[in-house]
Amino acid sequence: MLEGIVRESIGRKAAKALKRDGYLIANIYGKGLENINAAFKINEFIKEVRKKTTLAFDVKVGGKVLNVVVVDYQKDPVTAELKHVDLKVAQKGVISKYMVPVKIVGTAMGLKNKGVLIQSKRRLKVKCAAENLPNYFELDVTKLDVGDALLVRDVVVPEGVTMVDADRVAVVGVEKAR
């Protein structure tokens, strides 16, 4: 389990000092909860996020164990080093909005007909309780030919989950190569 510290000071000076010591600055928030300004060892955070098998994972901050989901992160544009991360507490029974990744399976038929596979949405916004949160949406693109696309309405959504994105938006498609 990932362990972090609660930041006493939230100023820029304190944040810079923590970053120099190898910490990643994080904000943890949730519906009806007080925001927690935390810091995690950057290498431990990256290891934990890479090895997680579900969208939500446990962190321990200030003696509390919280089940969180990565909402947003900021990277340095030059070094690609993580600078900041926002974590949302996934509370059981509380309906909230989450971004769920899209996994593409198969090879599109249109790729053999001089087409190019274009994934326009890498994550889809859903509204659900934490216990119904899917880890990812799997899309089979084997039947896609040049000019075809899979829309948000074509995604199979589990029970208890509602799609927030507009249903006419393309998720993945095959276009003619120029």
Swiss-Prot record:
Q: Where is the signal peptide?
A: none
- UniProt entry tagged with the keyword Ribonucleoprotein: yes
Q: List GO molecular-function terms, semicolon-separated.
A: 5S rRNA binding; structural constituent of ribosome
Would I find Iron among this entry's keywords?
A: no
Q: Which SUPFAM superfamilies match?
A: Ribosomal protein L25-like
Keywords of this entry: Ribonucleoprotein, Ribosomal protein, RNA-binding, rRNA-binding
| Any single biological process term in GO | translation
Q: Please give the CDD domains that the UniProt record associates with this protein.
A: Ribosomal_L25_TL5_CTC
- A GO CC term? cytosolic large ribosomal subunit
What is the documented function of this protein?
This is one of the proteins that binds to the 5S RNA in the ribosome where it forms part of the central protuberance.
Describe the subunit structure: Part of the 50S ribosomal subunit; part of the 5S rRNA/L5/L18/L25 subcomplex. Contacts the 5S rRNA. Binds to the 5S rRNA independently of L5 and L18.
**Member of which family?**
Belongs to the bacterial ribosomal protein bL25 family. CTC subfamily.
- The protein's name in its UniProt record: Large ribosomal subunit protein bL25
The record lists the organism as Campylobacter lari (strain RM2100 / D67 / ATCC BAA-1060)
